Amino acid sequence: MAKSDYYEILGISKNADEREIKKSYKRLAMKFHPDRNPGNTTAETKFKEIKEAYEVLSNSEKRAAYDQYGHAAFESGSMGATSNSGGADFSDIFGDVFGDIFGGNRRSRAGRGSDLRYNIELSLEDAVRGIIKEICIPTLSTCEKCRGTGARSNAAIITCMTCHGQGQVQIRQGFFSVQQSCPTCHGHGKIIKEACNKCHGNGRVERSKTLSVKIPSGVNTGDRIRLSGEGESGKNGAPSGDLYVQIQIRKHPIFDREEKNLYCEVPISFSMAALGGEIEVPTLDGRVKLKIPPETQTGKLFRMRGKGVKSVRSGGNGDLLCRVVVETPVKLNDIQKRLLQDLSDSFEGPHGNRNSPRSKSFFDGVKKFFDDLTR
């Protein structure tokens, strides 16, 4: 598959100067950095393309070769590995530019600990009010016996003879030499002769740790809380990964939630719907009174401002929307049936259409529909 044009990747013209190249690179690298897009393979691929484009265009010799020969200038040539002496060193191009944004450089991040994810389920009440939860997570932590070296003792650690302790070797690629991790020591620069008998040379051991997580008020399903440095410990003193707490809200028996707003259904009697009245409705802060006007129909929404959920981002409160449902009476005795029949008969008089305007409109429409069909 053809590789993308480096200038297009960075969104710059072919006449862009060094300042424009660096500015565009910082902006795009910040946007697609893996730390900001954990688990997003598309962003990771884009980040690698951006980094590759910058490494070429920020170097005057590489840029000149690319302008003349395109990607062919960097097709693999001889692949002889050498120690880290002589030739151009491009290993810190990325670290120098990006270190001030995220800290550290590529070498220090090579052994960075893995990020962890923990799913936590909350009640709606806890999500709305906020809560502190204790969680217990399995993780890899630095071995206390060898302090993360993986060796039985300091004397059991020797310098790698392939890379002479640098952790990297140079590879010939096209017109230039580029660096990669040493295949002998895997980038560590040192080799362990005798492994620690507790972590068996890994430098880390499995254990569980308990953390207190502060859940802010207003969180919702899908929100994530990042605990920096609480993931797995890094290797050989590299930084630890992060812990991402994923929020899931349990279904509530009364309320449904949509962003900041809460919804609930409130049953009212046939007589209250017709005559009006006052009822108590539930809120997360307790019961409140709601006035029902006469002639209320099923499905009417009543908005109670500020009785919803506080936004975790804007801070403002949402509303509670109560949808009334007119309940049909059941298990009627003879007296009640007779009274309802009398009421129904009264609707059949000359003014009955006034009592059910929607029914009249509906059936008038049905009649017109069938009349039109028979013409």
From Swiss-Prot:
Domain J: 5-70
Biological processes per GO annotation: chaperone cofactor-dependent protein refolding; DNA replication; protein refolding; response to heat
ZnF start-end (CR-type): 130-208
Cofactor: binding comment: Binds 2 Zn(2+) ions per monomer.
Residues the record lists as binding Zn(2+) 1: 143, 146, 196, 199
Domain of life: Bacteria
Transmembrane segments: none
GO CC terms: cytoplasm
CDD domains membership: DnaJ (cd06257), DnaJ_C (cd10747), DnaJ_zf (cd10719)
Subunit structure: Homodimer.
Family the entry assigns: Belongs to the DnaJ family.
Name the record gives this protein: Chaperone protein DnaJ
Protein source organism: Blochmanniella pennsylvanica (strain BPEN)
